[in-house]
């Protein structure tokens, strides 16, 4: 798989790094670790929203060399929960994120997959927290999906599962898997280690802004690594053919 993004000695004051790594096309990479590990800081840096020490190459070019307009065509970024910036119909908000605004069928498909069919005419400031999160997710998917944006390469998601129920999380997993199969690179933060063990291809385990481990999910999410990150003891079990992590007392 080709390298989409290369990080070299990336650091930000006392909050992050230095750390290095690479993001590959057609894979889902999870950032895991305790609160304050630096996951959100790292995602914002990878999105080009902040600057600091070290270097990031995106599609073979320095990240800082990308204009905001061009960057928005090649990568999409979902930050942590935000309130709607202003009131407008959901369909209008989603349309603003589409590069090809004639693809109304795609908008309807993505909205339907995230159970937003009956919310398209509602104002963004009249949504619940979970509804707004799904609208935001639909927006970044529409922005970057190769179906309508052949230039799309990278999707960055900061705790995308927040405020989603089990069915909605499953729906999002299906969408992300489909995007991955179309060649998109996906990087997302997660607090659900078992979800990472099931759905990520690779993982970066962070603590205190440092990278404790990186590699295939099974190699990273080991009891010794997790004990070092969280200060708690874990066991990894096989239950009906699925691996699962549990805390031990």
Curated annotation (Swiss-Prot):
Enzyme Commission numbers on file: 7.6.2.8
Subcellular location: Cell inner membrane
Binding of ATP, residues: 33-40
Keyword Transcription: no
Domain of life: Bacteria
Listed Gene3D superfamilies: P-loop containing nucleotide triphosphate hydrolases
Entry keyword Metal-binding: no
PROSITE patterns, A to Z: ABC_TRANSPORTER_1, ABC_TRANSPORTER_2
Keyword set, alphabetical order: ATP-binding, Cell inner membrane, Cell membrane, Membrane, Nucleotide-binding, Translocase, Transport
Listed PANTHER family: METAL TRANSPORT SYSTEM ATP-BINDING PROTEIN TM_0124-RELATED, VITAMIN B12 IMPORT ATP-BINDING PROTEIN BTUD
Protein name, entry field: Vitamin B12 import ATP-binding protein BtuD
Taxonomic source organism: Shigella boydii serotype 18 (strain CDC 3083-94 / BS512)
Taxonomic placement: Bacteria, Pseudomonadati, Pseudomonadota, Gammaproteobacteria, Enterobacterales
